């Protein structure tokens, strides 16, 4: 029997759109209450209105802002599940990437993710329970053309997730990586580089949907108390 999420309190970052938004909806459907955060307040409020009364609370802000993260951690309180999902992506050849684009990806995908996870994990350690779910990527285990910097950020985030799993297990805290392949989200459409557009045209498979990834999050969150799904990899059929 899998664990019920009824009455569980979850925090989802990057919830304004894509995987984060789908994850909020999936967790609510499974019975959890969710604190959803992202940069776009209007989208978060629209998301909350789609859910049953008081199932979703929203707080908009930038995870790169230390003061906001402190406020978010205090608001999250005794959170049972944290889904660290916020991220950015720029597809381009390595030598065409600007330093600003590179810095933004490392700052958001690695440092901001770690900042909020660190704050929430501290509270979980005091209670000696909790589940941290980190959205990494197939890119955490590969390096591919047009996405080298993104791969580097996901390699770093995966290493942090694995380290947290080792250090937090003695406190009864689970850490799971969800590692999807290409997903049909806004983040995938952020580059107009000709080589990127051409590569997308010739692909021979359909990307995963945000809902498919969200279902994997719920699957991991519902694992039996003594079972920790360390890594859940998802690939579009035909993409291997």
Question: Each PLM stretch: what is its role?
Answer:
Residues 173, 177-178, 198-240:
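C-terminal helical subdomain
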Residues 137:
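Residue(s) in the substrate-gating loop at a strand-loop-helix junction
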Residues 122, 166-169:
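Alpha-helical segment proximal to the catalytic Tyr-Lys
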Residues 9, 16-17:
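Conserved glycine-rich cofactor-binding loop
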Residues 93-94, 101-106:
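Substrate-binding pocket helix/loop in short-chain dehydrogenase/reductase
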Residues 20, 117, 153:
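Active-site helix of classical SDR
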Residues 32-46:
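Conserved glycine-rich Rossmann-like NAD(P)H-binding loop of the short-chain dehydrogenase/reductase
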């Amino acid at each position: 029997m899998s664990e019920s999420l009824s009455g569980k309190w979850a925090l989802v970052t990057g919830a304004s759109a894509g995987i984060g938004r789908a994850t909020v909806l999936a967790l609510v459907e499974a019975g959890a209450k969710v604190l959803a955060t992202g940069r776009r307040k209007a989208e978060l409020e629209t998301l909350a209105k789609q859910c049953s009364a008081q199932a979703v609370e929203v707080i908009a802000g930038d995870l790169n802002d230390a003061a906001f993260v402190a406020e978010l951690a205090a608001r999250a309180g005794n959170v049972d599940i944290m889904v660290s999902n916020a991220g950015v992506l720029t597809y381009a050849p390595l030598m065409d990437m600007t330093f600003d684009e590179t810095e933004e990806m490392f700052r958001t995908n690695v440092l901001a993710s770690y900042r909020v996870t660190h704050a929430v994990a501290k509270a979980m350690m005091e209670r000696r329970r909790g589940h941290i779910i980190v959205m990494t990527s197939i890119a955490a285990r590969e390096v591919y053309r047009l996405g080298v910097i993104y791969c580097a950020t996901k390699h770093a985030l995966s290493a942090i997730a694995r380290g947290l799993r080792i250090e937090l297990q003695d406190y009864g805290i689970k850490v799971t990586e969800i590692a999807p392949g290409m997903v049909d989200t806004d983040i995938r459409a952020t580059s107009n580089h000709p080589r990127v557009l051409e590569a997308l045209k010739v692909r021979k498979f359909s990307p995963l949907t945000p809902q498919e990834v969200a279902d994997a999050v719920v699957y991991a969150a519902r694992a039996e108390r003594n079972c920790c799904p360390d890594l859940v990899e998802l690939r579009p059929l035909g993409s291997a």
